[in-house]
Design a protein with these regions (language model features):
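Active-site anion-handling motifs in enzyme catalytic cores
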Residues: 1-183
Length: 183
């Protein structure tokens, strides 16, 4: 068979090859392909005054997610929550954190705030972080599973593993020099 199967990270490529699939190529996630050196050169290196964040309803960690949101409140002037998934809002409500601006759960709403405001993205939704980078906004993805973590290993997309969430204030306050390596 001369057809190739595209995968988004080296981990998946090696795993499939170990199972005997030799027609595999790591092309990274197609959503990253436009993140060229020229594109990312327009992304601010320093922290914005405002932030939009996401949570993931199927990857709950009440303690660490509460710490994340409170750290965002401590380090940004305005904090916005964008519920991407169907049950993200109910999860956010269970955290019982006040003082958060809640956005409508639609992609156009998320895109609008990224385009119109000087704002950072921090959150557990991988592709929300990639969307922020596509729209030339500073982003820090909180890695809750191997997808974001493995993609970061290959590409350099900024990811902080949730188990290290205590490092969030340092990560958001330091200058972020993006050096991406998209296959």
């Amino acid at each position: 068979n001369n057809m190739l199967h595209s995968v988004r990270d080296e981990y998946t490529e090696k795993k499939l090859i170990s199972y005997g699939f030799n027609n595999v190529i790591n092309t990274s996630c197609p959503t990253t392909w436009e993140l060229t050196e020229e594109h990312i050169s327009d992304i601010d290196h320093s922290k914005s005054k405002d932030v939009v964040f996401t949570l993931t309803d199927y990857g709950k960690n009440y303690e660490k997610d509460t710490l994340m949101v409170n750290d965002l409140k401590d380090n940004y002037r305005n904090v916005y929550f964008w519920p991407q998934g169907l049950h993200d809002m109910s999860y956010f409500n269970k955290l019982a954190i006040n003082g958060i601006n809640v956005l409508a759960p639609s992609l156009p709403t998320f895109e609008k705030i990224l385009i119109e405001e000087n704002i950072d993205y921090v959150g557990t939704r991988l592709h929300a972080g990639i969307k922020a980078l596509q729209l030339k906004r500073r982003a820090l993805i909180i890695g809750i599973d191997n997808r974001a973590i493995e993609l970061s290993k290959d590409t350099g997309i900024p990811v902080l593993e949730r188990e290290n969430i205590h490092n969030l204030p340092d990560m958001i306050n330091k200058l972020q020099q993006l050096e991406l390596h998209i296959p």
